[in-house]
Amino acid sequence: TEYEINLENIFSESLDFDHKIVQSACRDLQAYVDRDPACDHYVTPLLFYKGFQALQLHRICHSLWIRDQRYLARYLQSKMSEYYGVDIHPGAIIGGGVMLDHATSLVIGETAVVGDDVSILHSVTLGGSGLQSGDRHPKIANGVLIAAGAKVLGDIAVGEGVKIGAGSLVLESVPAYVTVAGVP
């Protein structure tokens, strides 16, 4: 039909447009091997880990987003959300060497930034804190660990090397190399 989507062409165009997609995917793959004790081989995330797969699809969606193909980016993101249970807005910027462990119920908002070498576990939200528009989501620096169920909300900065405990609610910026846990 005339509305058929040729994913192979979309992916090829995105990879041609942004060569960092493949570099980031390789770094992501290495992150799983290095940080996930259940990952016994490089092929495991490629075939079986929805966090890895969703992240790679996000990279394609983000490429479409910045090339102003926003309806297509949102469509693919919506399908990703339905299939994987992972909701990453196409506008979100995500570095390389990122591990989304399990990834079920993960939400990353439009203006969120995730640095390099970050580990995010399931049921994490990097979201806004209200109805404001514009820059409204967290900025996560390199080397951060965000444990299961944590909620990091608002236009705040989480410094390099921070560890956020499971189930924590973070509403204020966090300096580098500290551990935060709990609910304010």
Language model segments and positions:
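Structural signal for interior beta-strand "rungs" in well-ordered beta-sheet cores
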Residues: S81-P184
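Terminal amphipathic alpha-helical/low-complexity segments used for targeting or macromolecular assembly
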Residues: T1-K79
